[in-house]
Amino acid sequence: MEQPTTKRCIVSTCGTSILTNQGHEIRKLIIDYAHVKDKTDIGENDRKELENLIKTIKNSLQEEGSIENLKKMSAEINGITLLYDNHFPNSGDTHYLIATDTWLGTEAASLLKDWLRGREVNDVQLVAIDDLGASSLAEFQLGIAGLIGWCSQTLPGWRENQYTITFQLNGGFKSIQGLMQTLAQFYSDETVYIFESGNELLHIPRLPVKLDLEEVVLKH
């Protein structure tokens, strides 16, 4: 595959699909502990089962060389590889993985980070936003403010350095995807989703919108 000449900064929302795709029984366990921040708050037996699952998936990601099989393991990997026309990522791009600050959310994103680095993508950063995985609306709103603050502090510099900023929103929780879709109009050049066929990406360009987003957030 010919490497693209455009420098890209790719921001991917990350959920727990890489964990829940392992079967119905483990999915229930993950849902039960989705909002837990400290793994020591989980009973020993359940915690060990989840830790073993994470180790197994990490090994599978390292050993699996088929893109089609990798895409089935994770919505995030599916979206990222489709962004590269069903090839492995370009090693010269920058990737931010937006995750919740829960234990399972951070572990799932760490698996993706390790996979990307294993594909020689060196500039990969996991961004765990405080309270973005909160179970209460009041706490989640604090997470929203934190995510907006991160975008405003981090992403404009990439555009100034002539990078194309892509929001890759195929993974992550629906509430976070909806928020990121709004933020994309201010901080990204395009947003990508998997089309209904499951084999193509829908590219949504940034609209020419100007608004003091931080001021709006403070008012609400």
Where are each of the predicted segments found?
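Glycine-rich beta-strand-to-loop/alpha-helix junction loops that act as flexible
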Residues: 170-171
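Long, low-complexity, Lys/Arg-enriched
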Residues: 1-164, 178-220
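Polyanion-engaging groove/track-forming segments
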Residues: 174
